[in-house]
Curated annotation (Swiss-Prot):
Belongs to the cytochrome c-552 family. HAMAP family: Cytochrom_C552 (MF_01182). Pathway: Nitrogen metabolism; nitrate reduction (assimilation). This is Cytochrome c-552. Substrate binds at Y202, H253. Its EC number is 1.7.2.2. It comes from Shewanella woodyi (strain ATCC 51908 / MS32). GO terms for molecular function: calcium ion binding; heme binding; iron ion binding; nitrite reductase (cytochrome, ammonia-forming) activity. PROSITE patterns: MULTIHEME_CYTC (PS51008).
Amino acid sequence: MVRILTKKSFALSALVAASLMASGAMASDKTEPRNEQYKDKFSKQYNSWHETSESVEITDALEQDPNLVILWAGYGFAKDYNKARGHMYAVTDLRNTLRTGAPKKDTDGPMPMACWSCKSPDVPRMIEEQGEDGYFSGKWYKGGAEIVNTIGCSDCHEKGKSKLRISRPFAERGMEAIGTPFDKASRKDKQSMVCGQCHVEYYFEKTADKKGFVKFPWDKGTTVEDMEAYYDAIDFADWTHKVSKTPMLKAQHPGYETWQLGMHGKNNVSCTDCHMPKVKNAEGRKFTDHKVGNPFDRFEETCGNCHDQSKEFMVNLDKERKAKVKEIQLRAENQLVKAHFEAGAAWKAGATEAEMKPILTDIRHAQWRWDYAIASHGVASHAPDEALRVLGTAVDKAADARVKLAQLLAKKGVPQPIALPDISTKAKAQAALGMDMKKMNADKEEFKKTVLPKWDAEAKKREATY
């Protein structure tokens, strides 16, 4: 029997079909990377997340502390290192930094695809589409037109839901390595684990089967000594230091690891308790504030939930802890800078690899420990005791290297102390290393003018098909 549809029944059928299509699309597990797609259903969270754009100031860490240029000599961070800004700037700042160079095609540039891995919900989208082998292969340029949505909703939440998720397979493997699989964790633990997808120490693998993959070095544990032992066991180095020829380790931002060791972590005060508290909007409705930031900016909703001291007291206590950490940090830097130049002098004087090996091991371990402490941005607040302990061992190991160097330099007939170049400013330190900053900056400006518009146009065309 043939059924004749009236206008009314046809319209109703079309409406039902459209509804089913929409429901089917939302039911898909595929990552939706476009953050604006969530602004209606989760308006309060979306609007507060968007306020991370207010951290407009760019703070040049190399300008503030020129020692860093020498400590990272031969590595990208000696070119450019700004303090972190809000999540809204994750993609922008990675595009603009000198560390990513000025590539003109997908085979150019100093950095691999893995450098995008914590910057965008486009990353899990690409991994879903291409697999990890496809995503991690190639240079950073390859992801330019694909990775355009900054850190947002789908990085931490299942599609269209408030339910938390880990969106990176490498992060899942990391959590499993330390016996805390995400699917078995409590919601309270998950609130920190989603942050631990990115606010962690990681490295890029160099094995043939997983070259360029991101991995957390947690196989032996998550302390500074555990990860140091792991890296030593696999003979891993991020780069060779330009002055001392030390096989170096570059710590990333082990916030999750250091948080666990502090009083907040030990009492299971989560990342969100302090950095994304529950707040009330103008209508009095509670929601999770996604303007990730300083707990002191929302003291009553964060610190005030547990502490009965005043905001002034807590702020001053935090300042005191930061000052103590900074003091030992600078002591470690002073020892390390001298050790690098003294090692360089030893090589020039004819030192052998056998003579230098124990010295370079001390420098490697000292700088790794220093970097582990300072790269964890909030360590003075999260785990001040651990920060001071680790920095103290960095000072000791750097001093051990310098004692051995003094003996070796004397043996080689080299007058001491070794003359050091003027590194009192960022520019002078970079010049001392022979870095052509004028060319690097000019190349980057050309890249921003010619390549970035091309990436954005390609991305817009692709997203129009979603």
